[in-house]
């Protein structure tokens, strides 16, 4: 029973977080030597740092054609938009679904669908609030184009936010990806944009809470109309 309870709270940690947790823990030890109350504040900050870099296992649906959320967070925008020019996907608008991640969300990013990475393009920029529409254009970003088995393409864009200062991407052109596979992360608050292929409608609504690698965002085989939702 105790082991089961611990497993509920203790999750695997992304490798990027190990150095930060080590630094926080070291500073905490020094704070205890200086003044015990400061040490306990350090403990809380160390625990928060571990929590931020958590990398829990996700159960990804494996049915062909499903597109899953690439990030934990809340759907902040659904609108037509031209994918980043640096990906070379053309000037035609695609349906863009934006998932905003707060500092309390898991920041590990996962592939929305299986395919082959055909382009990876980093572009420096500003650090505006990632929930703003113009963040897609103005902010620092890293964009991926993924070619699906049927030849269609999907774009995934990691966007730095007001607090985020580092985008990590572990894939390069030619990398094969499975649906839900980890491909990077963004540190300390950010956003993920997904550009859907033509004719594919999102099956989520603005304000909906998303779980990376699990929540179905769209279905390539579905003829269902775009969903709408309301807070209850």
Curated annotation (Swiss-Prot):
Subcellular location: Cell membrane
Pfam families, per the entry: PS_Dcarbxylase
Pyruvic acid (Ser) PTM sites in chain numbering: 190
Taxonomic source organism: Cereibacter sphaeroides (strain ATCC 17025 / ATH 2.4.3)
Record function comment: Catalyzes the formation of phosphatidylethanolamine (PtdEtn) from phosphatidylserine (PtdSer).
Reaction catalysed by this enzyme: a 1,2-diacyl-sn-glycero-3-phospho-L-serine + H(+) = a 1,2-diacyl-sn-glycero-3-phosphoethanolamine + CO2
Protein name in UniProt: Phosphatidylserine decarboxylase proenzyme
Recorded coiled-coil stretches: none
Major localization class: membrane
Source organism superkingdom: Bacteria
Positions annotated as active site in the UniProt record: 190 (schiff-base intermediate with substrate)
Keyword terms: Cell membrane, Decarboxylase, Lipid biosynthesis, Lipid metabolism, Lyase, Membrane, Phospholipid biosynthesis, Phospholipid metabolism, Pyruvate, Zymogen
GO molecular function list: phosphatidylserine decarboxylase activity
Site (Cleavage (non-hydrolytic)): 189-190
GO CC terms, sorted: plasma membrane
Record's bilayer topology term: Peripheral membrane protein
UniProt pathway: Phospholipid metabolism; phosphatidylethanolamine biosynthesis; phosphatidylethanolamine from CDP-diacylglycerol: step 2/2
Quaternary assembly: Heterodimer of a large membrane-associated beta subunit and a small pyruvoyl-containing alpha subunit.
UniProt similarity note: Belongs to the phosphatidylserine decarboxylase family. PSD-A subfamily.
Textual note on the cofactor: Binds 1 pyruvoyl group covalently per subunit.
Cofactor: pyruvate
EC number: 4.1.1.65
Keyword Cytoplasm among record annotations: no
Listed GO biological process terms: phosphatidylethanolamine biosynthetic process
PTM (free text): Is synthesized initially as an inactive proenzyme. Formation of the active enzyme involves a self-maturation process in which the active site pyruvoyl group is generated from an internal serine residue via an autocatalytic post-translational modification. Two non-identical subunits are generated from the proenzyme in this reaction, and the pyruvate is formed at the N-terminus of the alpha chain, which is derived from the carboxyl end of the proenzyme.
